[in-house]
Amino acid sequence: MSSTGSAQPFELPEFYVPHPARLNPHLARARAHALDWARGMGMLEGSGVWEQADLEAHDYALLCAYTHPECDASMLSLVTDWYVWVFFFDDWFLEVFKRPGDRTGGHTALERLALFMPDGPPGHDVNARAPEPRNPVEAGLADLWARTVPGHSPDWIARFSVSTRNLLVESLWELDNISIGRVANPVEYVEQRRKVGGAPWSAGLVEHAVGAEVPAAVSAERPLRVLRDCFADSVHFRNDLFSYEREVGKEGELSNGVLVLETFFGCTTQEAADQLNRLLTSRLQQFEHTFFAELPPMFVRAGLTPEQVAAVLTYARGLQDWQSGGHEWHLRSSRYMNRRAGLPSGPSGLGSATSGLKALLGITGGADRLRRHTRTPHPVGPSVIPEFYLPYPTRLSPHLEGARGRLVEWNRAMGMFDEGLWWEDKAVDYDFALCSAGIDPKASAADLDVSAAWLSWGTYADDLYPLRFGATRDLAGARAQDARLRSLMPLEPEAPTPPPVNAVERGLADVWLRTITPMAPAGRRMFRAAVDAVLDSWLWEVENQAAHRVPDPVDYLEMRRVTFGSPMTASLARMAHMDVVPEEVYGSAAMQSLEAAAFDYSALMNDVYSYQKEVEYEGELLNMLVVTETFFGCDYRTALRVVNDLMTSRMKQFEHVLEKEFPAMYRDFGLDAAARAALDRYADELKQWMAAIATWHAETRRYREEDLERHHARRSAPVVAAAAGALPRAPHRAGWA
């Protein structure tokens, strides 16, 4: 039962806990130290937030002893102090700013806290004098920063500083939603919870506690990002399940995953809790998949030393310890709804060994794991197109007709009609010039041609990779092709490049030079990074296809933004405003929310239209409807309704950000009229982008059943088998040019 003794709003589900929790032997010392430290910082009697009894009942030392079982006594005390500070900050911000709805005061307080966290770039004095603390939160942060940061690399300090700032600043997002009674949509919630929930910050502390920094060379690579994000989501979802009664029932919080799913699906609290637990299990299993399937290739590609590999593995084990230990603490702390507070670890009596074995063997969630690998292609019939919520019209360029003809000739010149994958009638049917004409209706004819070429090239490659590399499980060939494509994107137009040997290479080499030649060096680097991200995502798709694996829902959606080419869209738009919009604005919650909502909306629309093409004709698994069917175990119509509801919620979030969050962002950053006008134009460009993509999907002859039958029949002709031999092969194989 909960600490109040009242009926629980739902029964806690059966959790997936594959690793046993361990307890640090220095617990008693950490408890005593935490009490003295909190009192010394002014967090107890007289603070108006906690009394000694509160701290003792919450027992953060027990949390840290479970989540950091191997560190020594002094390190455990330091880590415990950090968690005392974080939880005190959360309760302090609630009492002082959230309850009164004082956004201005909250923003001022958070700005001051940043002064106690020097970024620590190379050459910076991390012990630089900070202002005199005015309250327990500032005093605690000043003390902890000075005790933690010295001795760490600039990369770790920068990452830890960002995650700590996010933890603090995103409290304003929660405050804003409370003030207007708004419950976030599921995708928005996951993204914001990572920041305000603090688990990415906890991951940084794990590096500190285990004495194993993640090497800077790989700290931003996808496998490390996924490990961190899976860790964060799992920690947050678990906390949401245990804290629902207190946060939602007593404190009026709206930032809770159970409430988010309850609101989105219109289901009961119990049903929402069960679904959140399934998502928690899925994220933990994604962590395991990433550890075993993605880390080893990354080690080889990055050329890490044995010591660096050991550091990454030690860090990953630390995250694993945190998951199991955090679960054990939630079962005990009086802060949460639980049935076993204060009881010995694990069940006792007859059958207890079997219960523990079930958790260790991962039987909980086993059916979901199996279902992700056993999906088979099958006839599905024509894709059903629902009524989409899209409040923005499409305007078309007057250069459209000319661009259509020029694009077909460009396809021919690049050799896209010579490899058995595309032919002229097919390219005409696809009509990418129509999409470009709506994305930028004011573009010159030349710029429209470049835009259409990018869309055509990207789709050609998107058709090529699954057929040539995914279906054949030729991961080496995919990586070889990837390396050659990267070699064709010099930052200087005059730089020598290898001669292209196939259509996808010729297309990239041509459109790359036409795009970057007029750019400034900074713009070229930004755009190169965006295209690199898209290339990375294509390899991820091939790897999933080779493993015959339906992705985790969160991982899929986040990667879908990239596979859809969204980073290229964002980078080109940002270049137009680089001179008037400060770079840090693009990292703000409002800007990231706006972009992600737009990108998700259009990527999911593509999944709705392409369902029959990808599932029935191509046997692919990377489609949000397939992911939804697999995760929920539901039929196509139900999955379609869920995806369309998600699209609608993302579009409404886009509108909400523009109406509510952009004005606040303008004030928070003190932006002048020119910067505000530039960002308003960017928002209008995103509206045009979404509307153009919707118009193109409705009119293209790429997804209709009669066109699929015609296109598929011709692609299946013997010419395809002959042409496949001319497609890229791994460098060590005969025939590579």
Specify the residue positions occupied by each region the protein language model found.
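Alpha-helical, largely C-terminal catalytic domains
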Residues: 1-737
